[in-house]
């Protein structure tokens, strides 16, 4: 005596053997779709990472330019001080050679 479950399993197995190529193509399509979703997800993550790195690069370039400006500014002050010391024989004021002028 065969049970309905056994009969159903036999029918499914027969159909799978009979339409093996169609089942295989269907499974490949599903796998391809899942891989497509995975690839799209990874691509979006990489694009986000590239944009973040580009922003970091821009921030670092701006900081570099600001540091160069600061370096040139500080260098200009030391250049003026050096010229004042050598060519004009100027020196830093001390308490002895400073004069306090009071306003009345």
Curated annotation (Swiss-Prot):
Instruction: Say if the entry is tagged with keyword Nucleotidyltransferase.
Output: no
Q: Primary place of residence? A: membrane
* Membrane-topology descriptor: Single-pass type II membrane protein
- Membrane listed as a keyword: yes
Q: Where are the transmembrane segments?
A: 20-39
Which Pfam families does the record match to this protein?
FtsL (PF04999)
Q: Which UniProt keywords apply?
A: Cell cycle, Cell division, Cell inner membrane, Cell membrane, Membrane, Transmembrane, Transmembrane helix
- Where in the cell is the protein located? Cell inner membrane
Return the GO cellular component terms, semicolon-separated.
cell division site; plasma membrane
Question: What Gene Ontology biological process does one annotation of this record name?
Answer: FtsZ-dependent cytokinesis
- Membrane side Cytoplasmic: which residues? 1-19
Residue intervals annotated with topology Periplasmic: 40-104
InterPro entries on file: Cell_div_FtsL (IPR011922)
- The superkingdom listed in its UniProt entry is Bacteria
Q: Which cysteines are joined by disulfide bonds?
A: none
User: What family does this belong to?
Assistant: Belongs to the FtsL family.
What this protein is reported to do is described as: Essential cell division protein. May link together the upstream cell division proteins, which are predominantly cytoplasmic, with the downstream cell division proteins, which are predominantly periplasmic.
Q: How does it assemble?
A: Part of a complex composed of FtsB, FtsL and FtsQ.
Protein name stated in the entry: Cell division protein FtsL
Q: Which organism is it from?
A: Psychromonas ingrahamii (strain DSM 17664 / CCUG 51855 / 37)
Originating gene: ftsL
